[in-house]
Amino acid sequence: MQNYKKYAIPPAQLIIADVPYNVGKNFYGSNPSWYVGGDNKNGESKLAGKAAFNSDFNFNLYEYFHFCSKMLKKEDKKPLARGRSSDSPCMIVFCSFEQLPTLIDAGKKHGFVNYIPLVFVKNYSPQVLKANMRVVGATEYALVLYRDRLPKFRNGVQIDENGKNIPNTGHMIFNWFAWERDGKDIPKIHPSQKPVRVLKQLIEIFTDEGDVVIDPCCGSGSTLRAAAELGRSAYGFEIDRNFYTRAKEEMLVFNKDGQMHITDFI
C-alpha cells in the first residue's frame, strides 16, 4: 500500500478488508483439513502446522491503519437534517473475536474514534474436530470504523420533494447478518475468502453506485467482484503473487452487461 499514490487511485467512500489473523501455524488447528481426508486415523495432511498465507506472520496493523486513513475520503462537513446520515466514509475490517479490542485501539490512534461491531451467523462450523469437546464457533466478526460523523448509510429510505423521509420506505438494518455462502459460479481462491453475497450487502449499505471501494488486503478479489457487480469503482492491493494471479485469472474474469474485465481493475 505504501506506493498507492503512484496509481492515482481516487479517495474511497468505503475501505473493506479481511486483515490477517496472526494465528500463523495454527490456522487449520480445529479444521479437518489438518488431517488427510479429515480423519486423524489417516495422519496429518500437508496443511498441518502450516500458515494459510505468508503475511499472517508479519502484518503491521498500525501501518495498515495509517495508509487506510490516507486513502479514505475526507469527512463530510455539510449540515445535516435530523435523522439523516452524512456522506462521510468508513472502513469495515473483518477480524477474529480476539482481535476486536486491538483493532478498536489501533483505529482510535489513527482517527477512527467510533465503531459499530458486526456479527455474521453461519449455519455450519469449520471446527469439526472440536464438535464432541466444546461449543464450536459458527460466527464471523467485523468492525465498522469511522471518524466523527456516522458514515453514509443506505437502508432504502426515500426522500420526498420537500426533503423529508417518505414513511415506510426505509428498513431497520441489524448488526448481525446471515453468512450466505457463494455458489459454484464464484471460485474458491483464498482460505479465508469472504462470500461475494455478504460483501454485496455491506457495500450496498455504505455506498452508492459510482462510489469508490478499496480492499487493501485483496486476496481472492471477491471484494472487487462484489463492488464491480454493484456498479462501484473497485481497487485492490495484494502482495502475494499467487493470490493476485488467481484473482486476475479466475475471480475477475466475468461479464457485467458484457463489459467487465480484469483491465477495469488495473
Task: Describe the residue ranges of each PLM region.
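Short acidic, low-complexity intrinsically disordered linear motifs used
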Residues: 258-266
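Conserved SAM-binding loop
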Residues: 247-248
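Core catalytic lobe of class I
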Residues: 1-237, 242-244
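Conserved hydrophobic residues forming the short capping helix/wall of the S-adenosyl-L-methionine
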Residues: 107, 251, 255
